[in-house]
Amino acid sequence: MQQRRPIRRALLSVSDKAGIVEFAQALSHRGVELLSTGGTARLLADAGLAVTEVSDYTGFPEMMDGRVKTLHPKVHGGILGRRDQDDAIMTQHDIKPIDIVVVNLYPFAQTVARENCTLEDAVENIDIGGPTMVRSAAKNHKDVAIVVKSSDYTTIINEIDANEGSLTYETRFDLAIKAFEHTAAYDSMIANYFGALVPPYHGDTDKPSGHFPRTLNLNYIKKQDMRYGENSHQQAAFYIEENIHEASVATSTQLQGKALSYNNIADTDAALECVKEFAEPACVIVKHANPCGVAIGGSILDAYDRAYKTDPTSAFGGIIAFNRELDEETAQAIISRQFVEVIIAPSASDAALKVTAAKQNVRVLTSGSWQQRVPALDFKRVNGGLLVQDRDLGMVDTSQLRVVTERQPSEQELRDALFCWKVAKFVKSNAIVYARDNMTIGIGAGQMSRVYSAKIAGIKAADEGLEVKGSAMASDAFFPFRDGIDAAAAVGISCVIQPGGSIRDDEVIAAANEHGIAMIFTDMRHFRH
């Protein structure tokens, strides 16, 4: 099975023509005969290459507006023919062996992503001949190489040169795996698109759910294996989407430090997604997927100083995210002040990297800049199933807020309320966030009762000597009882922001009025589990 196969004849038919002329030139210069179709053949001919149209080779014209081009025995016989046992029948029918197939498929994903895409547009961008050739070549990888990625062009030419015009079995097998992955992803996209057009019904209503396909097909690419998972007895790997349109931990570049662990990646994602909510220079410090300090400042150093003050104990061994370039002064403050697992920012200055280099184990990542948040799906696995929902991109502005108490919030209270509301979205439920002057001063996370999250936020603030009086409090969901408001009043909270929607809203509002607290309803919940 280690046999090399000489490359004498190539079939090229691509939708994405990036690099194809140069690749075809390299093959031709090495004596490889070129077969091609339609637009690819014209492009190669215009580049001065000797190329045979598939229709001339088969003696059968392209037809039906190009729907039928390569679906012919002389094409697939040349691809599927087994060199050690089908030679006679191939000779009998004048079928020439094809040694390498270079194909990429109609741009279905790009087509259906367009706002004005019609069903007819989608249908016409379903490739038939391409996947058929890809699968044929991948099946017969013992004799044929299949290329579906332009990123492999240079590697293939280099190996042909290194192996006297041949490709090894190991390379052909690896290319076949990529090919099957490619067609699986392509068919999944089509199935997901069409499945979402069928009106499935749910529960006891007759309203079609739409939006989600009947069968969900997911394709992710392995970026790296992990030493272990959440715990040392669990194996793990990190998979990413093939086409990511937003700066994220998945697209980040690691500039220094040890390999990222499973928990590092999860926590870094939590920190980065939180810091993206802020337009001003901001810092988010995360521990165990929960923010333990968040602040806005005049600079990222100022923001870091303020975020760190929220909870220095929890910040130890944490993840730090910024929404501005990491500079030398901020890097020095972090390295001299605390043990940190990961620092992530859109970019990092050379001077900052010289500082962090003194701590070689510290992982420094750059995410690139972000312009907007991209709608996507969130997944949560349960035993035997998968919960799927839209990504929570909801956020309110001042025009959407409802003040429900007798007292109106001051301008400062309103700013603090909106700040801690943004933070609460990223704290595990039940989530309570205390904030003042664009800085968290206490965070209560993940408690089974909301009132205890409120109490913990107060305890955290007291432990660090942070003044709560006159601060704002955010709750990710409504208060089911007045006790959360009473607990907030006891430590000096003057403004509360929450979704509202409890059957006891009147009691909760009355409690706020009793304590002279301004209360704002957002009419939007941010559970996080």
From Swiss-Prot:
One term of GO molecular function: phosphoribosylaminoimidazolecarboxamide formyltransferase activity
Signal peptide stretch: none
Protein encoded by which gene: purH
Pathway listed: Purine metabolism; IMP biosynthesis via de novo pathway; 5-formamido-1-(5-phospho-D-ribosyl)imidazole-4-carboxamide from 5-amino-1-(5-phospho-D-ribosyl)imidazole-4-carboxamide (10-formyl THF route): step 1/1; Purine metabolism; IMP biosynthesis via de novo pathway; IMP from 5-formamido-1-(5-phospho-D-ribosyl)imidazole-4-carboxamide: step 1/1
Keyword field: Hydrolase, Multifunctional enzyme, Purine biosynthesis, Transferase
Protein family: Belongs to the PurH family.
Disulfide bridges in this chain: none
The protein's name: Bifunctional purine biosynthesis protein PurH
EC annotation from Swiss-Prot or TrEMBL: 2.1.2.3, 3.5.4.10
Reactions catalysed according to its record: (6R)-10-formyltetrahydrofolate + 5-amino-1-(5-phospho-beta-D-ribosyl)imidazole-4-carboxamide = 5-formamido-1-(5-phospho-D-ribosyl)imidazole-4-carboxamide + (6S)-5,6,7,8-tetrahydrofolate; IMP + H2O = 5-formamido-1-(5-phospho-D-ribosyl)imidazole-4-carboxamide
Gene Ontology cellular-component annotations: cytosol
Species assigned in the record: Pectobacterium atrosepticum (strain SCRI 1043 / ATCC BAA-672) (Erwinia carotovora subsp. atroseptica)
Domain comment as written in the entry: The IMP cyclohydrolase activity resides in the N-terminal region.
Gene3D superfamilies in the record: 3.40.140.20, Methylglyoxal synthase-like domain
Gene Ontology biological-process entries: 'de novo' IMP biosynthetic process
